[in-house]
Regions:
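Eukaryotic intrinsically disordered, low-complexity regulatory linkers and tails enriched in Ser/Thr/Pro
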Residues: 1-13, 17-64
Length: 64
């Protein structure tokens, strides 16, 4: 799970495997495969980094 922040400051966790589309114009909007949309403070690049970190941690756990 990755931790994101809504524009109102509320933090929430999202399963990155559910992310279908991320747009940035100018607000960053995440749309999931379930049809939910979230407007977040993080940039598209920050979200990409969070997803990469999450996937690396999952792979490390499998190797242990």
């Amino acid at each position: 799970m990755i931790i994101l922040t809504k524009l109102n400051g509320e933090k929430f966790m999202l399963n990155p495997d559910l992310i279908e589309i991320v747009t940035e114009n100018p607000d960053t909007v995440i749309t999931t495969s379930t049809g939910h949309s979230y407007i977040v403070e993080q940039s598209m690049n920050e979200i990409l980094s969070l997803i990469k970190e999450y996937r690396l941690s999952v792979r490390r756990q499998r190797l242990e």
